[in-house]
C-alpha cells in the first residue's frame, strides 16, 4: 500500500483486587498559606533536579520532607546529602508507604517511565498534587487514565516539560507563528540528534545489584531477568521500561513542536521508519528513527539520531542549526528553537529577523514555581504544562513507536517508493539514509524497519482497523501494580 498522498488526505481530512488505593475521604485541602510538604520519588537521575527545585522554593512555603527510592544506596546518599544541609527527610523505599503519610502534600515523580502514570494516579487518589516527569506515561491508555484521575479528584498535575516555562523565549515565538507573520506552516520538525553509543552485550542474565528492591523496581512491568550490563538508565532502551530516545530526550522537542502547531489531539495518521543501527547490543529501541505525524494543518516530523555525523566523528548532525531542537518551516521563512529557552526567526533568504530569549530564566525553577502557584490557586488552567498537554505529547511518541514495533524490514528503494507522494517525507528519509551512509551502515545487508501507516480516531485515542496496534495502546500489568481505569 502507498503510504500516502498528502494532497489527497487533506481533501478528506475502578481498580482490580489488590490494587493500592486511598479513599479520597481520608484527605483534606490545605489553606493557601500553609506549608506544602513534598517528597521526591526516584532520584538516581532527573530526581536530583526535582530535589534542587523543591529545596529552592522555601520562600514559597515548600518544604522537602521525604525521599523515596527503591535503591538503598541511592536513598542513603540522598538522605545524607540533605542531612549535611541541616534538612531532615524521612526515607522511603515503597511509594505506597509515602502516600499513606497524610502530611505529604506534593509528590514529585522521577522514576523510570513504566512507573510514571501508576505512581501519579496513586498519588492523586491519595489526595496529593503531582509533578511527574516526561513522558507522563509508558503507553497511551495509562496516560489518559492519569488525565482522568487529575480531573476526577481535582488535583494539580504538572508535566516535567520545562520548556513550557519559557514563555518569552519560546512562547512568544509560538504566538508569532500562529499569528501568521511567517505565512502558512509547511512542516514542523523535531530533532533529537544526541550521541547514544552501544550499551554492550551480555550472554547471560545479570545479577540484581545489591540493595535494590527489584520487585518494586519492576512495578507494573514484567519481572524479567536483567539482560543488560547496567540496570539503571539503560532501561530507556528496553521496551518493557522505556520508550527509546523518542520518549526520553525527544519528548521535550515533540512537545514544543506540537505547541507550535497548536494541536490538542493526537494525529489522525502516523508512521515510522528506522532501526537500531551502527552496532549490535542489548538495546531494543531505535537509535535512528523518523516519526511522521500527518496533521491536516501541517506534518509534524520527528527525527532521532544517536549516531554521530560520520564514522569516528564526535560531532552530531544538525538541521537548520538544530541538533536537539525544533525547526518550524513556513512559507515566509523559518524558526529554529535550538534550546529550552530561545528561538530565532529567519526570512526566506536565511536572514535573521527576530530573536526571542527567556527573560525569567526558564527551565526547572520557574516550572516548579508555576506548579506550586497552581497548587495554591487550585486552578489547573494556570499550569504551564498541565497533564493533558503532557499526555498528548507523550502519546505522540508512543504512537510513533507502535508503528515501528509493528513494522517490517525493507530496502531503501521500497521505502522511497512508498513515500514518494510526499516531498517532506522523501527529503527527510533521504537525509537519514545519507546520515547512515556517513556512518558506514550498509543498508544492503542491514535493513531499515518500515512501520505501517496507522490511522487513529483522535476522539477515542484508538486506532482504526488495526487490532494489533490497539493492543499496544496499553499493556498487561503485573499485580498488584495495576493502573486503574478512571471514568
Residue ranges and their predicted role:
Residues 172, 184, 189-190, 198-244, ...:
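Contiguous beta-strand/loop segments that form the cofactor/metal-binding neighborhood of enzyme cores
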Residues 74, 86, 110-114, 137-141, ...:
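Alpha-helix capping and helix-loop boundary segments enriched in small/acidic/polar residues
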Residues 129, 137-216:
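A contiguous active-site-proximal alpha/beta segment in oxidoreductase catalytic domains
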Residues 10, 51, 55, 79, ...:
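Non-transmembrane alpha-helical segments in soluble domains
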Residues 1-132, 141-157:
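N-terminal glycine-/serine-/threonine-rich beta1-alpha1-beta2 phosphate-ribose binding loop
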Residues 71-74, 92, 110-116, 136-138, ...:
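Short, solvent-exposed turn/loop segments enriched in Gly/Ser/Thr/Pro and often Arg
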Residues 37-41, 45, 64-69, 108-110, ...:
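Structural recognition of the beta-strand scaffold that forms the well-ordered cores
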Residues 47, 91, 116, 142, ...:
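Conserved donor sugar-nucleotide recognition element shared by glycan-biosynthetic enzymes
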Amino acid at each position: 500500500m502507498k503510504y500516502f498522498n498528502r494532497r489527497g488526505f487533506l481533501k478528506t481530512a475502578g481498580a482490580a483486587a489488590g490494587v493500592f488505593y486511598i479513599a479520597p475521604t481520608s484527605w483534606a485541602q490545605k489553606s493557601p498559606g500553609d506549608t506544602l510538604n513534598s517528597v521526591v520519588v526516584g532520584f538516581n537521575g532527573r530526581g536530583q533536579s526535582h530535589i534542587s527545585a523543591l529545596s529552592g522554593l522555601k520562600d514559597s512555603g515548600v518544604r522537602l520532607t521525604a525521599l523515596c527510592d527503591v535503591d538503598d544506596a541511592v536513598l542513603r546518599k540522598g538522605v545524607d546529602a540533605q542531612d549535611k544541609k541541616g534538612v531532615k527527610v524521612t526515607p522511603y523505599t515503597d511509594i505506597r508507604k509515602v502516600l499513606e503519610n497524610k502530611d505529604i502534600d506534593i509528590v514529585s515523580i522521577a522514576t523510570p517511565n513504566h512507573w510514571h502514570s501508576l505512581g501519579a494516579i496513586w498519588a492523586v487518589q491519595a489526595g496529593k498534587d503531582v509533578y511527574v516527569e516526561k513522558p507522563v506515561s509508558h503507553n497511551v491508555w495509562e496516560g489518559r487514565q492519569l488525565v482522568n484521575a487529575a480531573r476526577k479528584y481535582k488535583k494539580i498535575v504538572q508535566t516535567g516539560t520545562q520548556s513550557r516555562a519559557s514563555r518569552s523565549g519560546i512562547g512568544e515565538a509560538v504566538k508569532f507563528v500562529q499569528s501568521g507573520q511567517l505565512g502558512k506552516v509547511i512542516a514542523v520538525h523535531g530533532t533529537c540528534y544526541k550521541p547514544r553509543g552501544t550499551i554492550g552485550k551480555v550472554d547471560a542474565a545479570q545479577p540484581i545489584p545489591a540493595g535494590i528492591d527489584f520487585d518494586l523496581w519492576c512495578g507494573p512491568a514484567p519481572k524479567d531477568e536483567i539482560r543488560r550490563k547496567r540496570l539503571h538508565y539503560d532501561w530507556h532502551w528496553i521496551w518493557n521500561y522505556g520508550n527509546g530516545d523518542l520518549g526520553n530526550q525527544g519528548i521535550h522537542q515533540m512537545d514544543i513542536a506540537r505547541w507550535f502547531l497548536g494541536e490538542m489531539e493526537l494525529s489522525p495518521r502516523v508512521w515510522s521508519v528506522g532501526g537500531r543501527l551502527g552496532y549490535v547490543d542489548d538495546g531494543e529501541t531505535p537509535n535512528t528513527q523518523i516519526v511522521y505525524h500527518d496533521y491536516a494543518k501541517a506534518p509534524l516530523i520527528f527525527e532521532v539520531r544517536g549516531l554521530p555525523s560520520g564514522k569516528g566523528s564526535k560531532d552530531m548532525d544538525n538541521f537548520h542549526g538544530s541538533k536537539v531542537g525544533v525547526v518550524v518551516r513556513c512559507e515566509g521563512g523559518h524558526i529554529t528553537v535550538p534550546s529550552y529557552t530561545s528561538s530565532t526567526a529567519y526570512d526566506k533568504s536565511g536572514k535573521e529577523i527576530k530573536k526571542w530569549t527567556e527573560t525569567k530564566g526558564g527551565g526547572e525553577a520557574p516550572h516548579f514555581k508555576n506548579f506550586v502557584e497552581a497548587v495554591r490557586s487550585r486552578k489547573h488552567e494556570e499550569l504551564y504544562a498541565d497533564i493533558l498537554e503532557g499526555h498528548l505529547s507523550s502519546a505522540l511518541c508512543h504512537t510513533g513507536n507502535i508503528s515501528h514495533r509493528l513494522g517490517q524490514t525493507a530496502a531503501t528503494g521500497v521505502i522511497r517508493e512508498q513515500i514518494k507522494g510526499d516531498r517532506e517525507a522523501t527529503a527527510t528519509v533521504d537525509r537519514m539514509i545519507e546520515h547512515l551512509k556517513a556512518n558506514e551502515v550498509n543498508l544492503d545487508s542491514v535493513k531499515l524497519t518500515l512501520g505501517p501507516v496507522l490511522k487513529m480516531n483522535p476522539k477515542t485515542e484508538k486506532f482504526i482497523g488495526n487490532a494489533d496496534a490497539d493492543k499496544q495502546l496499553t499493556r498487561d500489568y503485573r499485580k498488584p501494580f495495576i493502573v486503574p481505569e478512571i471514568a
